[in-house]
């Protein structure tokens, strides 16, 4: 970060105007390499048949690629695509992914520097900003959901073309060469028929191939989509404060009616009255958001219509109304942050005694519940070959060549991650079933390695060596909350939110 700041200070100009030269700096690719952006190994290793040596990373290939782009202008003006590999030579995926990874690192620099400078100036982040972070979702779930009635489950639509992401990014970064190179990169994949830019799988494929570049482009797009909320909140707040003033201060009632009428004269200001709701809440994580309210079903339908029209008119793409699902909390369960959440109504009767007469009082209570989504998780475990589609554990043959300790460690790490992530669940029965699948799959894998049956293997070694699957989380809880007086098994049934669960992206993204 110090090198980036020094570079921008030498330029003597606005920071985001000079990102393009960073593509030719060695430490950019060393930084991307050290971050381990590719889970299967760094992509910044030059191929032996190209460079003559292995396990080296440099900007030589990037310079060669960019030079070909601008000298030949192959992608834009070429009519004959009979030799699609001509542009990149030996390996088109290697070159293209390499330059895109470097570009993703560079795009993050202005935002990182902005955060660092704000921290240096203010020394402390205001609490109002903290409440808008991802960590504020958990107390919001606990404290607010049980008091609300309606929910809109929203899937933020993707734009029809990647060019729209470039145009939105242009509002943040005014470096023309970098944006032009990004356009060429997208056009390159389009000409080759790469699946990441086909109409149906544009963004899904890009998020899998290059997640860092995907989120660098997608986050400004989401900020743009949500900008309307800030505008409506300010306008609605202004109208609401004016309205309350006219009611409470009766001595100046008629004097304030005139400017109040002028404020609402505009047609759009009148439309805002339809969306005034002091109990409206909006929460988002990545591409999924929820809009909850204590209002009526009519109000939620107006919000839905407004969203669809806003996306179509402002972003020029078709948004299907089915992407916004409206339902009552008591009749609807929704997926968010990897949980299946709901607010069921629990009716109960209380007997009241007054003198010699007694009567029953019907009481309705609502409690926010978070449940482990057992079916999607079993589907994910089935794809990873830990069980079949019915949830029956099977061995993991690809791990049979590892040592016993490595096998147990891998299964234990998966189990601990699941326990850690779903500790906020109000019902742990499904989590116990997932642990059972992993535990028995581990036993089957070890038995397969030693050419034995599971029963004989457990009888010979005992089942204690697998107990860490169930005891690790209890040990952590006993260290965090040592003063709890009631038994630990009751504590483990309590709902506990860990603020670092968003790092386990596979669990938040598989739903």
UniProtKB/Swiss-Prot annotation:
Cited InterPro entries: Domain_X (IPR024937), Maturase_MatK (IPR002866), Maturase_MatK_N (IPR024942)
GO cellular component: chloroplast
A biological-process GO annotation: RNA splicing
Molecular function GO terms recorded: RNA binding
Signal peptide region: none
TM region positions: none
Chief localisation class: plastid
Keyword RNA-binding: yes
Localisation per UniProt entry: Plastid, Chloroplast
This protein's record includes keyword Chloroplast: yes
Keywords from the UniProt entry: Chloroplast, mRNA processing, Plastid, RNA-binding, tRNA processing
Homology family: Belongs to the intron maturase 2 family. MatK subfamily.
Biological role stated in the UniProt entry: Usually encoded in the trnK tRNA gene intron. Probably assists in splicing its own and other chloroplast group II introns.
Protein name: Maturase K
Gene: matK
């Amino acid at each position: 970060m110090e090198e980036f700041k020094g570079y921008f200070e030498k330029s003597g100009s606005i920071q985001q105007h000079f990102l393009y030269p960073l593509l030719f700096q060695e430490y950019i690719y060393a930084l991307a390499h050290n971050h381990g952006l590719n889970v299967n190994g760094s992509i910044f290793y030059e191929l032996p048949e190209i460079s003559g040596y292995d396990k080296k990373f440099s900007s030589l290939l990037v310079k060669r690629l960019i030079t070909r782009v601008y000298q030949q202008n192959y992608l834009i003006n070429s009519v004959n695509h009979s030799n699609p590999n001509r542009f990149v030579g030996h390996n088109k995926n290697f070159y293209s992914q390499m330059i895109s990874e470097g570009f993703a690192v560079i795009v993050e620099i202005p935002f990182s520097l902005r955060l660092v400078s704000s921290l240096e100036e203010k020394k402390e982040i205001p609490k109002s900003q903290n409440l808008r972070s991802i960590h504020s979702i958990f107390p919001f779930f606990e404290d607010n959901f049980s008091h609300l009635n309606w929910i809109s489950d929203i899937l933020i639509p993707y734009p029809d073309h990647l060019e729209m992401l470039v145009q939105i990014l242009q509002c943040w970064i005014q470096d023309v060469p970098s944006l032009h190179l990004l356009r060429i990169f997208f056009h390159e994949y389009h000409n080759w028929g790469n699946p990441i830019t086909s109409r149906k799988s544009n963004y899904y494929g890009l998020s899998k191939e290059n997640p860092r570049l995907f989120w660098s482009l997608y986050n400004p797009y989401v900020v743009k989509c949500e900008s309307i909320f800030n505008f409506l909140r300010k306008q609605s707040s202004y109208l609401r404060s004016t309205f309350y003033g006219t009611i409470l201060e009766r001595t100046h009632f008629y004097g304030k009616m005139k400017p109040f009428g002028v404020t609402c004269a505009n047609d759009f200001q009148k439309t805002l009255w339809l969306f005034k709701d002091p109990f409206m809440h909006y929460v988002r994580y990545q591409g999924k958001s929820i809009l909850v309210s204590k209002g009526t079903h009519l109000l939620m339908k107006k919000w839905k219509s407004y969203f669809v029209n806003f996306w179509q008119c402002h972003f020029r793409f078709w948004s299907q109304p089915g992407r916004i699902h409206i339902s009552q909390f008591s009749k609807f369960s929704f997926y968010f942050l990897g949980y299946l959440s709901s607010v069921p109504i629990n009716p109960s009767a209380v007997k009241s005694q007054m003198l010699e007469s007694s009567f029953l009082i019907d009481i309705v209570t609502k409690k926010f519940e978070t449940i482990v989504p057992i079916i999607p998780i079993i589907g994910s475990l089935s794809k990873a070959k830990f069980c079949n589609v019915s949830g029956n554990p099977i061995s993991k043959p690809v791990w049979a060549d590892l040592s016993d300790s490595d096998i147990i460690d891998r299964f234990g790490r998966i189990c601990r991650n699941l326990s850690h992530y779903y500790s906020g669940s109000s019902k742990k029965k499904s989590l116990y079933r997932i642990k059972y699948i992993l535990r028995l799959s581990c036993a089957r894998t070890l038995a397969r390695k030693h050419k034995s049956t599971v029963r004989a293997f457990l009888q010979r070694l005992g089942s204690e060596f697998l107990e860490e699957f169930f005891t690790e989380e209890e040990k952590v809880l006993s260290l965090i909350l040592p003063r709890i007086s009631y038994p630990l098994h009751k504590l483990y049934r309590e709902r506990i939110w860990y603020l670092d669960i968003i790092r386990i992206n596979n669990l938040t993204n598989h739903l």
